Design a protein with these regions (language model features):
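Residue-level marker for buried hydrophobic side chains located in beta-strands
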Residues: 4, 37, 182-184
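Short acidic/histidine-rich active-site segments
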Residues: 181-194
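Helix C-cap/helix->beta junction micro-motif
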Residues: 57-59, 178-180
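Short, aromatic/basic amphipathic alpha-helical patches
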Residues: 50, 134-135, 143-147, 168-178
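Catalytic metal-binding/acid-base residues of hydrolase active sites
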Residues: 42, 68, 189
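Conserved active-site carboxylates
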Residues: 1-11, 20, 24-35, 59, ...
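Active-site-adjacent beta->alpha loops and helix N-cap segments on the catalytic face
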Residues: 21, 43-53, 164-171
Length: 277
């Protein structure tokens, strides 16, 4: 295997994906793949279900979560994709999710540094960094990249799948310090090409807009590309970035204890939801 999808939202990301977890895992298995990941935004509602189904289907589960992270005094966040190396890493993700959902706090780089056993992947796409690249503000860009040197190890997302994202993707070609960290990721929101229509309707509700407007934003979401489609899309381009997706998941070995510990996060979320009905 030379590629693993590391950016997959499920239907637990409210109105942002049509992906049913059971269908997703079984589809991965039908493609002859042995690993799959989940990265809902700032929530872990589907994590345990995902883990159980993966174990039933004999597919390796990689539990992740996307998080808005604020740097220094910046009021606009970057997106971090965080992957649990093990159960300790999963607990770190739970703590971050609780910090956001229950305590209504912003996640900072300090919180990431304090999170044990997680693998961070930084995304500059659809963030204020695009503006800095456009303005060619090299001083500020260098300052941001230097900030990440506090992390023991991190990767950087590259997503060349749509032309509208060329600004960030082309910037990477000027950054030798980031090239060795690039990992290929695609924003998977639905399983098959035929599911696009349903996703567009769902996402239109999420954005309080029309389906026509969503269709004009061709870069919003994609289906789960097969390995053949990845090869057709990129050929030998980004080959190392593709392989780094496997490098990431090779560091993840999740085993959840078969006891009540796993339900603490679920119970807290249920109480929170009931109090806010």
């Amino acid at each position: 295997m030379s590629f693993v999808h590391l950016q997959v939202k499920s239907s637990y990301s409210f109105l942002q994906s049509t992906i049913n977890i059971k269908e997703y895992v079984r589809y991965i298995k039908s493609l002859g793949l042995s690993t799959c990941a989940i990265t809902d935004h700032q929530v872990l509602h589907g994590a345990y279900e995902f883990y159980q189904i993966c174990k039933q289907e004999e597919v390796k589960p990689v539990i992740g979560m996307s998080v808005d992270v604020y740097l220094n005094q910046e009021q606009r966040p970057l997106t971090f994709y965080l992957y649990a190396k093990d159960f300790k890493g999963y607990q770190s993700l739970v703590n971050l999710s609780n910090l956001i959902q229950l305590e209504k706090e912003r996640v900072t780089l300090k919180h990431i540094l304090q999170s044990e056993q997680v693998i961070p992947v930084v995304s500059f796409y659809d963030t204020f960094v695009e503006e800095l690249i456009y303005l060619d503000d090299q001083h500020k860009l260098n300052e941001i990249v230097d900030t990440f040197n506090q992390l023991q190890h991190f990767y950087v997302k590259v997503d060349p799948i749509t032309s509208s994202k060329n600004l960030v993707t082309e910037w990477f070609s000027t950054r030798n310090d980031l090239k060795k960290r690039l990992v290929l990721m695609c924003d998977v929101r639905y399983l098959k090409v035929s599911d696009r229509v349903g996703f567009e309707a769902l996402y239109a509700m999420h954005q309080s807009t029309t389906v026509s407007n969503v269709r004009r934003e061709a870069n919003v979401g994609t289906h789960l590309l097969t390995l053949n489609e990845i090869v057709e899309q990129f050929g030998q381009d980004w080959e190392r970035a593709q392989k780094r997706s496997v490098e990431v998941v090779d560091q993840c070995e999740m085993t959840m204890p078969n006891n009540g510990l796993i339900f603490r996060h679920i119970r807290r979320r249920m109480v929170y939801l009931l109090m806010n009905i």
